[in-house]
UniProtKB/Swiss-Prot annotation:
Organism lineage: Eukaryota, Fungi, Dikarya, Ascomycota, Saccharomycotina
Subunit structure: Interacts with NOP1.
Biased composition (Acidic residues): 130-140, 243-268
Pfam families per the UniProt record, alphabetical: RRM_1
The protein, known as: Nucleolar protein 4
Taxonomic source organism: Saccharomyces cerevisiae (strain ATCC 204508 / S288c) (Baker's yeast)
Keyword list, A-Z: Nucleus, Phosphoprotein, Repeat, Ribosome biogenesis, RNA-binding, rRNA processing
Domain spans labelled RRM: 26-103, 147-225, 290-383, 462-612
Gene Ontology cellular-component terms listed: nucleolus; nucleus
Misc note: Present with 4990 molecules/cell in log phase SD medium.
Keyword Mitochondrion appears in the UniProt entry: no
Composition skew (Basic residues), residue ranges: 622-631, 674-685
One BP term from GO: maturation of LSU-rRNA from tricistronic rRNA transcript (SSU-rRNA, 5.8S rRNA, LSU-rRNA)
Length: 685
């Protein structure tokens, strides 16, 4: 008969003691479990509701699931919470039948013994009083005799034992903290903390009932040495089963208890017998011997087509394309395992360099490494932990290529290409017409092509290129609009209408601004910035080069004080619809009357970081440096001796002033003759 949480009376006494109705208030009995569910999957499901101590799916002698299992918790409240939520939540498409588990009926001797993971049981097994353990010396002060805590439901993000030492160091001296790992390098999901005194452990237990590590609630209990627990278990007699129905339930609970005991007592000092038992188990996710990882595989490749191709090197054990679990589609990679070392070495020896996934086949590439016209990239497989680190590194490289996390090597600032780009399907794309989207995409492709062809070109961090400007807009109006953009961006951030700049972007801006300055120059620049504006220059390109009057070409440039302000300006101005007031900002009354019919209002701006030539920028920087140095020099160093300059001026005047009056008269006669000849020539025409 099923028991539900509604008809279970919760005792007010210690939660670790047995309920009067024979129920274990810390354990759930779970039925209707699908046959393919593992212990780990069951544990993951219930850990969503509360921190669990242990979860086990009961199996028969053939290692097949019997369709039911047990889940134990550290606190009774967690059990009730998990019971209520598990009855309403589907697991692999099924609703599980969950009840409070019954405790087995044991002899009087065993009934007095409480769960080994509680403080009371730890004291009974070790056979020591509180005072004896607090003042323990000699044999009890050895590592095995030290009071130890086990922390279950540990988050995968916590990998440093020092973090645990800091947490539990608040309650007493921490001798050691360990976070065990499996043979494949994966974390076990629990940790051990050894403290100096058992009184420290009790204080820690009382204060860590609601402990969270990295946002995940954990369960803290006493840990007991495995050999002592084994001796204790041998001393306890087993009760015979009463009937067939109870037999299945009791056997399942016994298996559950044994599994729980083994899991809780595992630590670094585990005995050799346990190690031998563990070594017999087949390691999961183990790296296959003589296996390689293949990239640039066609998406339609199958095991049947890959195996014959790689059999050119020798005997193939398997050739499996990698399938994405979420989509069911091929990822374009594969694992291939060979049967012997020689074949494996032959495949690796002449393989093209990793990353050479080009569709263009070089002359030095052997035909064995070309599959359906693609050059295969082949590398030895890695253990899971190394592969994880490699994946993180490759992800960082991809982010750098996308401009999300630029590294120091990107000196051309190519990551800024994506700033201002509008992608189809985005909210900003809904504001633009199809023509505008086509123009933007053409502009992006043109910029990419220019940067590829000329390595001297780079993207400026402070200068913006603005397209689709209204024809009536001049330099003054553009500068006012750029200033407004920075102010409006800051206002929207303050009102939580827009995301602020990231910490990385602000650091990047500061680093770029003071890159070529010394400490004194930095201080002087900071004082200068307080007096100057955020916009250094704004220029609208006119049809007549060099003229300030005339018709605008519809694009211009704005240079900001630093990269931070440039980013703020770009993100606010991009796709901004220019208003009439913004256009007329820089015009006088006469000019306003002339351009009333050509305002071009409603145009949405296309804003990007401008492309610059590094040689021109370098030359300009040197000129500014020379001008700055020239201003700081004394006058006599720059112009020479004052006396000499005064003496030179009269000489120059003497040379240009005619000394003889006849020479002046002769010059006038010559001018008259030249003028007479010119008149005669014009008369003939």
């Amino acid at each position: 008969m099923e028991e539900t949480i509604e008809n279970v009376e919760v005792p007010s006494s210690n939660v670790s003691k047995q309920n009067d109705d024979g129920l274990d208030m810390k354990t759930l009995f779970v039925r209707s479990i699908p046959q393919d569910v593992t212990d780990e999957q069951l544990a993951d499901f219930f850990s969503n509701f509360a921190p669990i101590k242990h979860a086990v799916v009961v199996k028969d002698t053939n290692k097949r699931s019997r369709g039911f299992g047990f889940v134990s918790f550290a606190v009774e409240d967690d059990t009730k919470e998990a019971l209520a939520k598990a009855r309403k939540t589907k697991f692999n498409g099924h609703i599980l039948r969950v009840d409070i588990a019954k405790r087995r009926d044991r002899s009087k001797k065993t009934s007095e013994v409480v769960e080994k993971s509680t403080p009371e049981s730890s004291e009974k097994i070790t056979g020591q009083n509180n005072e004896d353990e607090d003042d323990a010396d000699g044999e009890d002060s050895m590592l095995k005799g030290k009071p130890k805590l086990i922390i279950r439901n540990m988050p995968w993000s916590c990998r440093d034992p020092v973090k645990l030492k800091k947490i539990f160091g608040r309650y007493g001296t921490v001798v050691e903290a360990t976070i065990p790992r499996k043979r494949d390098g994966k974390l076990c999901g629990f940790a051990f903390v050894t403290m100096k005194k058992i009184s420290n452990c009790r204080i820690a237990l009382e204060n860590t009932k609601d402990l969270k590590i990295d946002g995940r609630k954990v369960a803290v209990d006493f840990a007991v040495q495995k050999n002592r627990w084994e001796d204790y278990k041998k001393a306890q007699p087993e009760m015979n089963d009463k009937d067939d129905n109870e037999s299945g339930n009791e056997d399942a609970e016994e298996n559950h208890d044994d599994e729980e005991d083994e899991n809780e007592e595992e630590d670094r000092q585990v005995d050799q017998a346990s190690k031998n038992k563990e070594s017999k188990r087949k390691a999961q996710n183990k790296r296959e011997d003589f296996s390689v990882f293949v990239r640039n595989v066609p998406y339609d490749a199958t095991e049947e087509s890959l195996a014959p191709h790689f059999s050119k090197f020798g005997s193939v054990k398997y050739a499996l394309p990698v399938i994405d679990k979420s989509t069911g589609l091929a990822k374009g990679t594969a694992f291939v395992a060979f049967k012997d070392q020689y074949t494996y070495n032959e495949c690796i020896k002449n393989a093209p360099a990793a990353g050479s996934t080009s569709l263009l086949i070089g002359d030095d590439v052997m035909p064995e490494y070309v599959y359906e016209g693609r050059v295969l990239s082949i590398t030895p497989t890695l253990v899971r932990e190394d592969a994880g680190r490699m994946a993180e590194k490759n992800a960082a490289k991809r982010k750098e290529a996308l401009g999300k996390a630029p590294g120091e090597k990107d000196r051309r600032n190519l990551y800024l290409l994506n700033e201002g780009r509008v992608v189809e399907g985005s909210k900003m794309a809904d504001l633009l017409t199809n023509t505008d989207m086509e123009i933007r995409e053409k502009s992006y492709k043109l910029r990419v092509e220019q940067l590829k062809k000329n390595p001297s070109l780079h993207l400026s961090m402070t200068r913006l290129a603005i397209r689709n400007l209204p024809r009536a807009m001049n330099d003054k109006a553009l500068k006012a609009l750029a200033r407004k953009a920075v102010v409006e961006f800051a206002t929207e951030v303050k009102n939580k209408e827009r995301h602020p700049l990231s910490k990385e972007e602000i650091i990047r801006s500061t680093k770029e601004k003071y890159k070529f300055m010394g400490p004194d120059e930095i201080e002087a620049q900071k004082k200068k910035d307080k007096k100057s504006g955020v916009v250094k220059q704004a220029k609208v390109i006119m049809e007549v080069k060099g003229s300030t009057a005339g018709r605008s070409r519809g694009y211009g440039f704005v240079e900001f004080r630093d990269h931070k302000n440039a980013l703020m300006g770009l993100r606010w101005l991009n796709c901004h619809a220019v208003t009439s007031d913004e256009i007329l900002e820089g015009l006088n009354d006469d000019e306003k009357k002339q351009v009333d019919n050509d305002l071009g209002k409603g145009r949405r701006l296309c804003v990007e970081f401008a492309i610059e030539n590094s040689n021109v920028v370098k030359r300009r920087r040197e000129q500014l440096k020379q001008a700055r140095t020239k201003r700081t020099r004394p006058d006599n160093e720059d112009t020479g001796d004052v006396g000499e300059s005064e003496n030179k001026k009269p000489k120059k005047e003497e040379a240009t002033t005619p000394t003889n009056p006849d020479d002046k008269k002769m010059g006038d006669d010559i001018k008259r003759i030249i003028g007479f000849k010119r008149k005669r020539k014009h008369a003939k025409k």
